[in-house]
């Protein structure tokens, strides 16, 4: 059902419902899937950019299309990047003087969690950790390492669990934490 009664909303809802119905009919006898879940129907939201709100010149370094799109919505310049993790940090280093805020997204931690692949999730976190010294050499005011949600391997799904949060800054007071953990 459309969320509003505008002609545009009714037309979109009708089209989407027709597409879902056709796909469901086509998949009717398939053993692995019987329908499709479509999401993300909306207009580009009008929200203030990071430049307007915080006077930043932000850049996003991400491969996954959803995160690239979200970055654009909040006014970040989305930088081209290769497919390897090292590419993320190479771009950060080469573009560091051109921006004053960077969002660097490592997708595989989430993907391995959804696959239930603990060994590879651990490896990708450890591999990411090895790039921290490269970031520190750039001498940023702040480094934050966290996740947008938890994806425990045991659940193979996003969850309500807390995210570890690491903040390093010469302007922040240290705490007593000695490890980066969800506990």
Model-found features: residue ranges?
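Feature captures the catalytic ectodomains and active-site-proximal regions of enzymes
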Residues: 1-183
């Amino acid at each position: 059902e459309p969320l509003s009664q505008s002609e545009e909303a009714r037309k979109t809802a009708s089209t989407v419902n027709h597409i879902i119905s056709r796909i469901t009919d086509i998949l009717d006898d398939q053993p692995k899937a019987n329908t499709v879940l479509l999401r993300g129907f909306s207009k580009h939201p009008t929200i203030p950019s990071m430049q307007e709100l915080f006077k930043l010149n932000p850049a996003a370094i991400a491969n996954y299309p959803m995160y690239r799109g979200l970055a654009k919505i909040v006014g970040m310049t989305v930088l081209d990047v290769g497919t390897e993790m090292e590419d993320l940090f190479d771009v950060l280093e080469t573009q560091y003087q051109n921006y004053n805020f960077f969002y660097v997204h490592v997708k595989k931690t989430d993907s391995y969690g959804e696959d239930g692949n603990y060994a590879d999730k651990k490896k990708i976190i450890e591999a990411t950790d090895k790039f921290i010294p490269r970031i520190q050499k750039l001498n940023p005011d702040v480094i934050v390492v966290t996740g947008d949600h938890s994806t425990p391997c045991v659940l193979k799904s996003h969850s309500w669990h807390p995210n570890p949060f690491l903040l390093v800054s010469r302007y922040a007071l240290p705490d007593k934490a000695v490890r980066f953990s969800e506990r």
